[in-house]
Structures are given as structure tokens and as C-alpha cells.
Amino acid sequence: FTEEKAVVNADGVMVKRTRRVTSFDPATYRGRINIALDGLKKKYPTKQIVLLTPIHRGPASFGDDNVQPTEDFQNACGEYLDAYIESIKEASSIWSVPVIDTYSLSGIFPMHKEQEIYVPGGTDWLHPNEKGHHRLASCLYWQLLTLPCTF
């Protein structure tokens, strides 16, 4: 959000108050989420829209010029992964759409060697393997069952 001063009718009296304004800045992650959800809400007003958070990020190396650090490092923008997760949750509240928090609910935590059962291992602790996808799918299945499919 940004804030601006605006004149509004409050109980029959025109008063100046601070107003929150949703960001639609395409140069920001939050702005792009808001642009997308604004368009989806307009184009599909009767459909259930669901947001998902990413899962935890383990390390990955796919060559000298494609090395992905773990989530405990900031990205090139200076943000940690949890800042993006909070932005997704904020958008969920702004746009009245549910969010399935796979970051918390999936149980996949590739930061520990013992979690190798859910990732390819070796140089790729970022992507789920077949067991990881099954666990993620099960999480999504049970969460989606709690949501209305018709309105």
C-alpha cells in the first residue's frame, strides 16, 4: 500500500482523511500480484482463485552460471524468500482469495540432509522429486477440499 490524503464524506461532512491505495506498480512483486488478481477477479468473477506460497528452497547447482543458494540468503533484490511469502498472504487478504501456504504445510524442508527423501539430492535440493511431489499434491488435495468450488 501507499497512503494519500483524500476528501471523503463521513456522516454527511466532507473531511480530509488518509487513504490506503493498493499498489499496481509493475516494477514490484506486490504490484504485479495486484495487477494479476485485479484482472482475474474482473475476468472470472464467479471462479474460485487460490494462491500458493512456494515451498522451502534448498541449494541447487545446474552449472557454473546457474547456482541457486538456500533460502537463508537474500536474492539479488535484497529480499529473503519469506518476504515473498508475506506478499502472497497480504494479497490473499486484499483480494479475498484463499492462500495455501505450502511453505508451512507441505512438510518439505530441504535445508536438512534428512529431507533428501523429497528432493533429487546431489546438486538439486531445490525441486521436489516424485515423493516430494506426492507429498505436495497430498497437501494441496486436503487444503483444496476445504474450499467451496461453486458460489
PLM features: residue spans?
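Alpha-helical cap/lid subdomain in secreted, periplasmic
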Residues: F1-F151
